[in-house]
Amino acid sequence: MATYAVGDIQGCLAPLKALLKKVRFNKDKDLLISAGDLINRGPESLATIRFCMNLGSAFKMVLGNHDLHLLAVAEGVRSAGNKDTVEEILQAPDRQQIFHWLRKQPLLLQANRFHIVHAGIPHIWDIKKAYSLAAEVSQTIQSVQRKSYFEHMYGNSPDVWRDDLKGTERLRAITNYLTRMRFCSHKGELELKTKDRKTIEKPFKPWFEHKRHGRTENIIFGHWAALKGLPCGPQLYAMDTGYVWGGPLRMIELNSLEITEQPQLT
């Protein structure tokens, strides 16, 4: 059995299929894991999500910010933007089935000895705490409180974690760390506006450059296309190489650590 983790697909189904063909993916014995942002921006969001759903137990994913945005639009608390490519999903006859399936996906999951998350895991949380906090959001998304969650999901505050945070502020902070984070300070303060490492100012630096205080887990993440998949440090695997922006689509096999990429299709 081979286990593959793939970066941000964002509705680009053709390169995903090409990647799976390259590695001779067999849905009867292999597993594909998406690091989030399964849909949006690319040309085939509906076909992509249907394809992954049809893989059944051969597919797992964590939710990314674009996936959560779709669910917010589905709840009627947000409108699709000019750059969004989710209208086909919103009009699909099976849209309720799609939304139900998407709401059941976690924000953090473990496969083999790897932890997969969309944006990252802040150094101020140990791994047990990260899973516990991620579960708080997942449980809310699957509950009758989900509309309220999505109404209050957007925003950059609170910008630093406190254990005494409650309600919508607590859930927003957890969501921002796991699905939007790029830079943070030593204290865990988030800086959510900057994407370029060259322009970030102190005290902020990439979340993965902070000491993890004895944590040694392997982390696979997406979200940050500007990194271009360059090495981020030991046991860290950046998978978003920005296919939707002209880069390749990247996939890693978790046993061999072999990386396979699909360049832009013409």
Predicted features along the sequence, with ranges:
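Active-site environment of divalent metal-dependent phosphoester hydrolases
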Residues: 10-14, 40-42, 66-72, 124, ...
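Acidic, His/Gly-rich catalytic cores of divalent-metal-dependent hydrolytic chemistry
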Residues: 131-266
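Active-site neighborhood of divalent metal-dependent phosphoester bond hydrolases
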Residues: 46-49, 54-169
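N-terminal active-site segment of His-dependent metallophosphoesterases
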Residues: 1-51, 55, 68
